């Protein structure tokens, strides 16, 4: 999707271990990585390790702040599973994120996401299991006073890109086969939330359900086919030319208005 375009200056708008490990391996002039979590910032710095240069930055900040990276533009901007994660840090802000980032995109914008799988009716047994894991995870997060991620479909992102002033260059979809790591990581997240519950009976019931779900899912995840369910997508976009931001105003023919009536002179 990048082709022969240079990476130039690079912004990882919602960084994590995997994304920054990849970004720091690219031939960039400089990069900035933003996260709202201090813990994730430490993890990201470890991912960059010795490849962290003096011109590179890891920032702990929230994109709801208008001062963040004010006046800076980047040749390449990456949103790596970022829109789905916004709910945990800036709920109800998803529709504004692309407009917020638009001034920082000089060249190419890449958006990576997952098609939602928690709400839609699954068509296969593997899909049912993946959905059950997602619903159990979200239920435990809510009971533990957390906020579940909220994935958005590619169709929603494409509409928002147009509204925010971007032209879509390419869309690719990649079918997902979930493996053992996914099952265990999601269910371990569930277990961590149980410490927040004040109801021991409910916590034990959920713990039993978590382990039953693990026992059901792992044979599928360990098989050659894995848990085939849904797809990831990658969208490449770029800013519209300034002349394309709005349609030209219609040309109106001037109309001669009749003169205003004059007041009659007082008689007498």
What would you call each of these model-derived segments?
Residues 175-221:
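C-terminal helical/coil "lid" or tail adjacent to the Rossmann-like core of SAM-dependent
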Residues 227-244:
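Core SAM-dependent methyltransferase catalytic element
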Residues 68-77:
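A short acidic, Gly/Pro-enriched loop at the edge of an enzyme's catalytic core
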Residues 11-68:
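Class I SAM-dependent methyltransferase SAM/SAH-binding core
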Residues 166-177:
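Conserved S-adenosyl-L-methionine
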Residues 147-165:
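Short alpha-helix
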Residues 85-100:
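A short, conserved alpha-helix within the catalytic core of class I
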Residues 110-136:
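Conserved class I S-adenosyl-L-methionine
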């Amino acid at each position: 999707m990048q082709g022969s375009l240079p990476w130039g200056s690079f912004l990882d708008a919602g960084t994590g271990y995997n994304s920054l490990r990849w970004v720091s391996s690219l031939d960039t002039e400089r990069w900035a990585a933003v996260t709202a979590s201090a813990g994730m910032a430490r993890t990201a710095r470890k991912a960059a390790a010795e490849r962290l240069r003096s011109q590179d930055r890891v920032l702990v900040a929230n994109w709801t702040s208008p001062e963040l990276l004010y006046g800076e533009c980047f040749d390449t901007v990456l949103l790596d599973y970022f829109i789905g994660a916004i709910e945990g840090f800036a709920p109800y802000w998803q529709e504004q994120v692309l407009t917020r980032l638009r001034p920082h995109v000089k060249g190419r914008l890449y958006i990576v996401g997952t098609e939602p799988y928690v709400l839609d009716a699954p068509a296969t047994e593997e899909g049912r299991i993946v959905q059950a894991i997602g619903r159990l995870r979200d239920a435990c997060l809510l009971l533990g006073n957390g906020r579940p991620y909220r994935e958005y479909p590619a169709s929603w992102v494409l509409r928002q890109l147009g509204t925010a002033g971007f032209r879509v260059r390419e869309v690719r979809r990649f079918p997902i086969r979930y493996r053992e790591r996914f099952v265990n990581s999601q269910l371990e997240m569930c277990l961590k939330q149980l410490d927040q519950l004040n109801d021991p009976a409910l916590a034990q019931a959920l713990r039993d359900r978590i382990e039953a779900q693990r026992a059901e899912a792992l044979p599928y995840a360990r098989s050659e086919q894995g848990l085939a369910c849904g797809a990831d997508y990658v969208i490449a976009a770029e800013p519209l030319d300034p002349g394309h931001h709005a349609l030209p105003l219609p040309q109106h023919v001037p109309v001669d208005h009749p003169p205003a009536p004059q007041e009659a002179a007082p008689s007498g």
